[in-house]
């Protein structure tokens, strides 16, 4: 499928999935993946995030499962509002624009508090996630090397 056809299908799916008047759709954020994120702004100013996650490049079922596992642990993650996995389309709740980096650079006096919260969350995920580990691939040497290649590909753009 051509990208232009995919874009039309994606926009149509969004419009059919949201039961409200959409004011606009704008690019949101990006990550080191083939996913694209768009903020959907409704006429009442509510927002959602639409995700275009091509299934030939992304494991969307695993993405949904990890979101459920983290949510079950009490970790703040976007809620899955709707999904169409055959095409890799998702609508998730919008957690806003603020990142930890934003907080660190705008409020240096509390940076140690943010790091403590982050380490606490990582510890919580490590301890609480033990029961779910069999559902996820092992983070072994090969996976770690693959993740390091992502850094080179997406951030350094050397390949």
Regions found by a protein language model. Name each.
Residues 38-146:
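ATP-binding pocket architecture of kinase catalytic cores
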Residues 1-22:
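Juxta-kinase regulatory segment immediately upstream of eukaryotic protein kinase catalytic domains
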Residues 2, 138-159:
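Active-site catalytic-loop/activation-segment of kinase and kinase-like phosphoryl-transfer enzymes
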Residues 3, 33, 56-59:
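Alpha-helix N-cap/loop-to-helix initiation residues
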Residues 20-38:
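ATP-binding glycine-rich phosphate-binding loop
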């Amino acid at each position: 499928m051509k990208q232009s056809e995919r874009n039309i299908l994606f926009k149509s799916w969004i419009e059919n999935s949201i039961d409200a008047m959409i004011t606009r759709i704008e690019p949101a954020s990006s990550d080191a993946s083939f996913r694209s994120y768009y903020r959907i702004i409704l006429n009442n100013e509510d927002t959602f995030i639409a995700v275009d996650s091509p299934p030939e490049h992304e494991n969307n079922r695993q993405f949904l499962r990890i979101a459920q596992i983290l949510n079950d642990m009490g970790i703040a993650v976007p809620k899955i509002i709707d999904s169409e996995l055959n095409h890799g389309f998702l609508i998730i709740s919008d957690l806003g624009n603020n990142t930890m980096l934003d907080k660190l650079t705008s409020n240096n006096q509390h940076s140690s508090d943010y790091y403590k919260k982050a380490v606490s969350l990582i510890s919580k995920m490590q301890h609480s996630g033990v029961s779910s580990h069999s559902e996820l691939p092992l983070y072994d040497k090969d996976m770690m090397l693959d993740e390091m290649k992502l850094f080179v590909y997406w951030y350094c753009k050397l390949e």
